Amino acid sequence: MGATDREGSVGRAITANLLADFDGEVLAVNPTKDEVLGLRCYDAVGDVPDVDVAVVVVPPSIVLDAIREAGESGVRNVVVITAGFGESGSEGASRERELREIADEYDLNVVGPNSLGIMNTALGLNATFGPENAQPGSISFMSQSGAFVTAVVDWANDRNLGFRNVVSLGNKAVLDESDFVAEWGDDPDTDVILGYLEDVVDGRAFVQSAREVSSDTPIVVVKSGRTEAGASAAASHTGAIAGSEEAYEAALDQAGVLRVETVQDLFDFGSILAGQPLPERDGVAIVTNAGGPGVMTTDAVGDSDLSLASFTDETVERFQDALPGEANVYNPVDIIGDAPVERFEEALDIALADPNVGAAVVLACPTATLSYEALADAVVDLQAEYDRPVAATLMGGSSARDANERLSQAGIPTYFDPARAVRSLDALREYRDISRREYTEPETFDVDREAAREILESAARRDTNRLGVEAMGLLDAYGIPTPDGEIVDARSDAVAAAERIVGGGDEDGSDGDDGGGEGVVMKIVSPDILHKSDIGGVAVDVPPEEVGDTYEDLVTRARNYQPDATILGVQVQEMVDLDAGVETIAGMNRDPQFGPLVLFGLGGIFVEVLEDTTVRVAPVSEPDAREMVGEIDAAPLLRGARGRDPVDEASVVETIQRLSQLVTDFPAIVELDINPLVATPDGAQAVDVRLTIDQEEL
């Protein structure tokens, strides 16, 4: 729709690309033309029978009419090339909303708008205005940037890297990354999914879709907009609201997506995942004719999560028998600079046969005694024989070109820099671990939702968005352990509460003769006073005989500090021995893209100083919660470092899960902090809490 033969136009470029290799029928729609590039022109899409896909290349002023016309004609798949939508201001955003409404009305699958187009090499389909078609392959690639698509296809063609599908997502008004991940995950001819993303439309849907696919099909993504400036640029490019970088990092990890920061890594990882098997173990063998590059490669292995393979005694003996006396028969295996291809081949054969070797790097520098082409043939044969991943670094320029092409055609990736080879092998290891993950559904605990709802609605009735210790009942309702305590609004009630908690003191609050008992913690309760310690609104280790006077003192301090503050009372709480455990923090904040993010880390006064925290997208499963506890830097403290008794880690894990359920159940909770969550050998207790709510969500 919008086909034309005008030189330099998008309509002409797409029509020509479709006519080049497409196996199906191409039909042109343009009421002002009789013929375009040898094709008869139809006045309207309704005049054309059995249309599978409509490619819309008309001006913004009539694009909505064209899409509606396609829907009325029974077309179900539309690619909108036209720009001038959400990326171009309020008028464009309004146009994009109307496009979505039309798509909903006619049940249309729409790519774009503001898209470069789509490719499917199995069909010879190139419905883009890019300068060339992609080569066939097993990688499906989506990009939020159309310009990036043209550059990538050109780059990939130069390196014999083929694609199954290429999609320019555009503004993602209807179809987005989640849809294509799900579709390509079901495609037996897609071995790897690659993506360039600036934002995610529906974060929770993407996590769900990617998690279901990633155990069988690797997904590798460059997510730009990591910095504040980058996020701002991405927003202006796509018109999207960006989620936090922390949220993206957590979401992609949970979904089993490999995130990379460079285009080089995106396609390095894609190439090796598409062409090589996964390693059964982490040990890497390095076989080289160059000592210096061998050391560099060894350093790269040390910087990764791989390891330098330890050869068996039998392997070392085989190397000693096969190699010159000057050779290094330990890893990295240096077969000396004069090595012919036969020596390389025998050394690689011995290395791949070692049971401790999971993968190998073949590292060569050009010499007069070595034929790169013969070496490539040997590497291809040995990789096929052992079915273990091999990465090749044939250093040099024109001397390595033909050999690298031979290796690439066999699915063996080639690199000039050995560090890239190691990073790519490490990506295989990482995806192997992802593919072995056992995903479990988050547990649903038996909780008192109505009690929790009443606490939140009570706050809304008071027209307050912030809750402090009065939210302890919310935690109690969800089974999160808290110290014994209650909120009171009278001196006598404070004394009674203290007596109940620890014993001692007189009913009237006067000093008793026998004193006795442990002290209690007392805190002013006011939604208008967040930092209670700053105004002297917290008293610790208060003896029972002083509870009454302390109650009066706390209320007076609060009223003097903020006369118009709402004072709900004073919390009287049992003392918790912070030295008996580790102060941690558990909390959440609500991300615009991914919803509630659950946080765990080292708490108390160290939260903002050390920033030792980790996050997950809720709902959090038991394995996710266990990972959270184990991946903070302070994990050894929890597990008994320096002679300490280990904390009850299962209790901490369950607390994280219950918190996740709470914030998932109540979208009105915008932020929540339990700090400290004291973890001890006997369990975990939420000592203090504060949260913010959105009353409109109740």
Residue ranges and their predicted role:
Residues 1-672, 677-698:
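Catalytic-core regions of core metabolic enzymes
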